[in-house]
Curated annotation (Swiss-Prot):
Record's GO cellular component terms: cytoplasm; large ribosomal subunit
Subunit structure: Component of the large ribosomal subunit.
Protein source organism: Ictalurus punctatus
Cross-referenced Pfam families: Ribosomal_L1
Subcellular location: Cytoplasm
GO molecular function terms listed in the Swiss-Prot or TrEMBL record: RNA binding; structural constituent of ribosome
GO BP of this protein: translation
Domain of life: Eukaryota
Function: Component of the large ribosomal subunit. The ribosome is a large ribonucleoprotein complex responsible for the synthesis of proteins in the cell.
Keywords of the record: Cytoplasm, Ribonucleoprotein, Ribosomal protein
Record's keyword annotation contains Cytoplasm: yes
Name recorded for this polypeptide: Large ribosomal subunit protein uL1
Name of the gene encoding the protein in the UniProt record: rpl10a
Length: 216
C-alpha cells in the first residue's frame, strides 16, 4: 500500500477509535472504508466486482443461514447455525414478500450442492436481487470454517456511482487488526481498478457514527 503510509493508517484508526470511546453508542459501531473514484466512467468502463477475505471478521453480528441437505442441516443444528431444508424453502412458495423477508433476515447464505441449482426454481430471483445468492457448501468443508470464511469476506462492487463503501472492522478491534484489514482491503480494491491508484480520488475510514478520517 505504497500511497498510504503506516503512520497515516495508524493515526486514522486511533482517531476513529478515540471518537467512538468519547461517545459510547448502544451498538457496536462498524468501521467502514469509503472510496471515491476518478477517471472512471461507470457507463463505459467495465464495472468491477471482487471479494477478499479479511484476517479478522469485520462484523461479529453478521448472520449466515445454511440452506442445506439433511447432513448439512444436522451439522448446522449441532453448531447452532440457522438453517433451512428444501421443504422449508418450498413452503415459501416463491412468495416475493416471504423471500424478500428471508433475504433481509440474514446477511449471507450457504447452500448444499444438491440445493444450490434448485434455488432459482424454488425461490425465484429474490436472493439474487438482494445480492445474497448463496455460496456453495460442499461436504469436504468444515461447516464452521466455511461460515467464518463468509463472515470475514467483503465484496467490492462497482455500481453506477463513483463511490463505494465496505465494512472493514468494528471499533472494538485492536489497532493492529483494523490496520491489517484496511491494508488488505485497499490493496485488493486498487488491484481491481483499471489504472490502479490513478483511479482513486480519495480514501476515508469512519465508524458508523463518527467523523471520516482521510487516508489518501
Amino acid at each position: 500500500m505504497s500511497k498510504v503510509s503506516r503512520d497515516t493508517l495508524y493515526e486514522a484508526v486511533r482517531e476513529v477509535q478515540a471518537g467512538s470511546i468519547s461517545k459510547r453508542r448502544k451498538f457496536l459501531e462498524t468501521v467502514e472504508l469509503q472510496i471515491s473514484l476518478k477517471n472512471y466512467d461507470p457507463q463505459k468502463d467495465k464495472r468491477f466486482s471482487g471479494t477478499v477475505r479479511l484476517k479478522t471478521t469485520p462484523r461479529p453480528k453478521f448472520s449466515v443461514c445454511v440452506l442445506g441437505d439433511q447432513q448439512h442441516c444436522d451439522e448446522a443444528k449441532a453448531a447452532e447455525i440457522p438453517h433451512m431444508d428444501i421443504e422449508a424453502l418450498k413452503k415459501l412458495n416463491k412468495n416475493k414478500k416471504m423471500v424478500k423477508k428471508l433475504a433481509k433476515k440474514y446477511d449471507a447464505f450457504l447452500a448444499s450442492e444438491s440445493l444450490i441449482k434448485q434455488i432459482p426454481r424454488i425461490l425465484g430471483p429474490g436472493l439474487n436481487k438482494a445480492g445474497k445468492f448463496p455460496s456453495l457448501l460442499t461436504h469436504n468443508e468444515n461447516l464452521n470454517t466455511k461460515v467464518d470464511e463468509v463472515k470475514s469476506t467483503i465484496k467490492f462492487q462497482m455500481k453506477k456511482v463513483l463511490c463505494l463503501a465496505v465494512a472493514v472492522g468494528h471499533v472494538r478491534m485492536s489497532e493492529d487488526e483494523l490496520v491489517y484489514n484496511i491494508h488488505l482491503a485497499v490493496n485488493f480494491l486498487v488491484s481491481l481498478l483499471k489504472k490502479n491508484w490513478q483511479n482513486v480520488r480519495a480514501l476515508y475510514i469512519k465508524s458508523s457514527m463518527g467523523k471520516p478520517q482521510r487516508l489518501y
